[in-house]
């Protein structure tokens, strides 16, 4: 039964969840909030939704670029290099980004009489992103249920697994991860050095997947 909305960025995790739950998904939603890499990743989200016959929409959140503070919104040169778990990667946090996106998706779900909102946060996000942590997901799920007539639920099945484990799921599903985008710098190729590029490399290696991503280095 197609009773779900998915927040789909075009990255490895959300594309895996898209294929993993494709039989349940009625609508894919991407958000353009003015980050360096939105223009690189959203086309992949749209492409995969179209491939699966799932309606896709992109919602503009340009106000976040104007009013929010994050290196992710300041241009490629502002993105730190290093491992995803390093403290310097905290500069890439867009404050309450998932909370805002989930709130909109919950409203869209209720407006379309859909019961669930899917999001692909994972265990590796917990160190850096407060709105990816289990306690946040639990709280917003309870708020969604309490705040909607149709008892919309937030479902985040990857919350306590690693990106490598997500890649292993994708491997079983036959996903070509070359058709996803990770790099926060948003250049013509993945930079190969920022936290998301490093994490991408590690996840693919952990899952035993040949990495055909084009990296600058």
Predicted regions and their residues:
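Short cysteine/histidine-rich metal-coordination sites, predominantly Zn2+-binding motifs
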Residues: 186-187, 207-217
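Residue-level recognition of conserved structural "scaffold" positions that shape functional pockets
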Residues: 17-18, 199, 215
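Glycine-rich nucleotide phosphate-binding loop and flanking beta-alpha elements
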Residues: 125, 204-205
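Short amphipathic alpha-helical interaction/hinge segments
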Residues: 148, 205-208
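Local cysteine-cluster metal-coordination motifs and their immediate loop/turn environment
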Residues: 103, 179-202
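ATP-dependent adenylation/nucleotidyltransferase module used to activate substrates
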Residues: 1-174
